[in-house]
Amino acid sequence: VLFMAFIAGTFVVIGKNKLPETKAFDVGDYQYYIDKFPSEDNLGFISDSIDLLKKVEVIWINQYGERIKKQKPYQVFYDKANGIWLVQGTLRSNMTGGVANILVDNDTGRVLALWHDK
């Protein structure tokens, strides 16, 4: 029984560390948000999308509170040409309102924009 629990625990750990699916996007479509909702935050070095999500969640919790965790799973997008990440919350089908959004420069970790849809 312990062996089975160990194996099950191993799968849980492996599953939690799986890189989230990253979709493409064009940061040019988000210039309005960069202009209207700039941020002074900086996430520092970003090693991968898991690291990005951990750092983004800290920023979102500071800005919007713990309730932001209800917007999991977070969606990850990357503009390869410009080296920009976009992370968005997920709105459950039984909920109304908007989601948190953040644009981050991969090279510098600088948060370009931070906003919440309504």
Question: What would you call each of these model-derived segments?
Answer:
Residues 15-25:
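Ser/Thr/Pro/Gly-rich low-complexity linker/stalk segments immediately outside membranes or between
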Residues 29, 33-73:
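Short, non-transmembrane alpha-helical segments in secretory-pathway proteins
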Residues 67-117:
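Exposed beta-strand-loop-beta-strand "reactive/processing" segments of non-cytosolic proteins
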